C-alpha cells in the first residue's frame, strides 16, 4: 500500500503571502506567525517569500489569482480578519473571501492556504492570532508547505 503525505519542510518553495490591511492590528500577528513558520519550521529562505498587501479580505481572491497566474509561486497563504458586526456585511465578505480563494486553488491548481479569521468578536480574533488558540497564520503557512510537498509526491507517483 502506498501512502502519500506531505511534510512541512520545503526549503526551496516560493511562497506568496497575501495579507489584508483592514484589521491590521490582528493581521500583523498572523503575518508574524506565518513568516516565522515558513522560515523556522519550513526552512523557506527570505528571498523565496513575497508579501502582498491588499486593502481588505474581499480583495484577497483577485490578488491570489494574479499571484497564481504569474507561475512564480508554489503556494499562496491568504491572511485576513473579518469580524462580525451589526450588518450582513460579515457574511458577504467572509463568504466571498472563502469561496474566491477556494476557486483560485482549484482553477490554478496551486495550494492557497486559508488564513482568514472569521470571528464573532475581536476577542476571538486576538485568541486566534497568537494567544489562547494558537496562531492561525502559522497554521496556514504550514498547510501551504505541506500541500506543496504533497502535490509534488502525487505528481511523482
Swiss-Prot record:
It comes from the Bacteria. One of its GO terms (molecular function) is 6,7-dimethyl-8-ribityllumazine synthase activity. Pfam families: DMRL_synthase. Pathway: Cofactor biosynthesis; riboflavin biosynthesis; riboflavin from 2-hydroxy-3-oxobutyl phosphate and 5-amino-6-(D-ribitylamino)uracil: step 1/2. The active site is at 89 (proton donor). Keywords: Riboflavin biosynthesis, Transferase. (2S)-2-hydroxy-3-oxobutyl phosphate binds at residues 86-87, 128. InterPro entries: LS, LS/RS, LS/RS_sf. One of its GO terms (biological process) is riboflavin biosynthetic process. It catalyses: (2S)-2-hydroxy-3-oxobutyl phosphate + 5-amino-6-(D-ribitylamino)uracil = 6,7-dimethyl-8-(1-D-ribityl)lumazine + phosphate + 2 H2O + H(+). It is an enzyme of class 2 (transferase). 5-amino-6-(D-ribitylamino)uracil binds at residues 22, 57-59, 81-83, 114. One of its GO terms (cellular component) is riboflavin synthase complex. Its EC number is 2.5.1.78. Catalyzes the formation of 6,7-dimethyl-8-ribityllumazine by condensation of 5-amino-6-(D-ribitylamino)uracil with 3,4-dihydroxy-2-butanone 4-phosphate. This is the penultimate step in the biosynthesis of riboflavin. NCBIfam families: lumazine-synth, PRK00061.1-4. Forms an icosahedral capsid composed of 60 subunits, arranged as a dodecamer of pentamers. Belongs to the DMRL synthase family. This is 6,7-dimethyl-8-ribityllumazine synthase. It comes from Haemophilus influenzae (strain PittEE).
